Amino acid sequence: LERTRSLAHQYYSCYPFLSQICALWLNHFTLAEDPEKRREVLSDICDLCEHIKKHCKNISIYNDMTPIQSVAFLQLGRTQDVIDLLEDSCNPVKLSADSHKSLLLSQAYLLSGNIEKADSILQISMYDNILSLLGNAANYLAIHVNDLTVCEQTIARIGKLIEAYHLPGLHPNNTASFEYQAAICYLAHNKKEEALTHAANFVTCLSTLFTDWQILLHGDDYFTKIEPWFAMLDNGAAAPRSKSLVLQDIAKSFDYPAFTVLQGDPAFEKLKRKLKELTQ
């Protein structure tokens, strides 16, 4: 940490580098030895993001800092700061306008005769929107966990999306998160069999995720034009956190109190063993 702080101070006007420092700190602040140290790192992230946004003229870097700063604020419990930062940019009019940018850009490429580029833009947009829907649906389950009707409707609809777009193979990480939350929802209503089904789906997704030594974003036989886009991201196709750190978090998945009611169930104990094998 002190080494990266020193580098941040040394290159205080190199905003692309500072943005990477912010991302690095955010993805690893949990490694700090105590809660106070973690809060200190999060505060440093907020301050450095603010510095970058104040002085950097590169709009892409500026925009990248907003979600990083928002996550740091949330971790610090500064919810009003998150609202102040994001509320205007997330109003329905602006969200609708953003969703049309890819459509307009693809049409422009198509009309100029660049079909290949139009194809790529639309694939990237569809992929991004599908993952956004999947992530939002997991959060939607979390806030409606006490409403079984809403939960079951959401699980049924997103289940069709997962099947149609082969999401356990395309993006097992986000799919695992949804399956995990679905299991928790069913446990909240004492529906153990349904919970076990989704817990099993969760473990299956993790098995796919950790097949290779490195976690990489990738396309498939439908999304054939998105991998060059991954290469343009700051971390390329690689995950922002190392596999070992992800495994540490995953190992504790079934320690969540909601799963206590399944302790001793043969099917659940089998899933726990599979999870343990994955994380060793």
What positions do the PLM features span?
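Flexible inter-repeat linkers and adjacent short helices
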Residues: L1-E36
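Helix-turn-helix repeat elements of alpha-solenoid scaffolds
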Residues: L1-T4, D34-E50, V71-E87, Q107-D119, ...
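Generic helix N-cap/helix-start motif at coil->alpha-helix transitions
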Residues: S13-L18, K57-P67, V93-L104, Y127-Y140, ...
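Residue-level signature for tetratricopeptide repeat
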Residues: L24, H28-L31, A72, L104-A108, ...
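Short coil/linker segments at helix-helix boundaries
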Residues: N27-H55, N235-S244, S253
